[in-house]
Amino acid sequence: MKNKIDVSLIQSFFLGVWRFVLHLVSRLKEDQINVRAGHLTYVTLLSLVPMVAVTMSVLSAFPVFQGIRGTIETFVYENMIPAAGDTVQTYINEFVKNASKGTAVGIGFLVVVAIMLISAIDKSLNAIWRTKEKRRFMVAFSMYWMVLTLGPVLMGASIAVTSYLVSLKVLSEADVYGVVPMLIEKLPLMFSVAAFLLLYMAVPNQKVKFLHALLGALVAALLFEAGKRGFALYVTTFPSYEAIYGTLATIPILFVWVYLSWTIVLFGGVIAAALPEYLDYDDGGDEDAQGCQDAPSGEALSSPKENPSSSSSTKPKTDNDPG
């Protein structure tokens, strides 16, 4: 009896997973994440240099980050742009240096373009969550400005704290089983999970359950890490871009990787947004089915009520009836 129950539970679990996958595929088609990822790729490439310039300007305002600026840049480029991080870092640093020499109007334009990227992310994720109410202009602007100012500080602080903890002699001496190297290796994955979780919890203009956002963040982070390894392997194993584009091979590589990255980000968002829809529908269906099982047979089946006239007219005739 116990084995039968266990088998039925396993079957129902996998059936539920399969139904959710079908619902997810339908949701992906409706949301057109490939089109949204293309739009975000265009905006990202347009605002990449302004965003980096604003980020570095914010970090430069804090003396504590001066000594680890190179460490932060290396960590970001190595973990965000596989196989071409050094080249992209060289070009972007040169562009940022040129942009920092501009006038106040030019710097203001950089800030506006950087805000365009945050606004595009906000609109795409709220469209995936089917958010009907838009944020007020001042609320949205305050949120975008907070991301521009506090985002780099939090990122720099987290990397600085991690570097400090890793360099502690106490940890290195107490690390008998090699836990510290393992944690260092998993740091990019943990940062990705935290970043996606914050994105899925904060950006949609509605309440998102923590577990739903965490599941989407975990899937997106795992896909992001797998995508980095796979993309780096493809670029290094099949260097067709370098044979075609030569020294400009970094440009299409960056285009493709940014597009894949946004596809993964939006895919995780669709998972987090579709999960409560599916669970609500599934619970409703289960309740209806349970209600039909608990109800008496006469109430469970819908049949038209008999009226007295029709019942009397259909009575069988007896011998005493006339005619």
Curated annotation (Swiss-Prot):
A GO cellular component entry from the record: plasma membrane
Major location (coarse): membrane
NCBIfam families per UniProt: PRK01637.1 (NF002457), yihY_not_rbn (TIGR00765)
PANTHER family: INNER MEMBRANE PROTEIN YHJD, UPF0761 MEMBRANE PROTEIN YIHY
Chain positions covered by the region annotation Disordered: 285-323
Topology of the protein relative to the lipid bilayer: Multi-pass membrane protein
A Pfam family hit: Virul_fac_BrkB
Chain intervals with Low complexity compositional bias: 302-315
Name by which UniProt lists this protein: UPF0761 membrane protein Sama_3404
Family as reported in the entry's similarity comment: Belongs to the UPF0761 family.
Transmembrane segments: 5-25, 45-65, 102-122, 137-157, 179-199, 207-227, 251-271
Mitochondrion is among the record's keywords: no
Phylogenetic lineage: Bacteria, Pseudomonadati, Pseudomonadota, Gammaproteobacteria, Alteromonadales
Organism: Shewanella amazonensis (strain ATCC BAA-1098 / SB2B)
Subcellular location: Cell inner membrane
Domain of life: Bacteria
Keyword line: Cell inner membrane, Cell membrane, Membrane, Transmembrane, Transmembrane helix
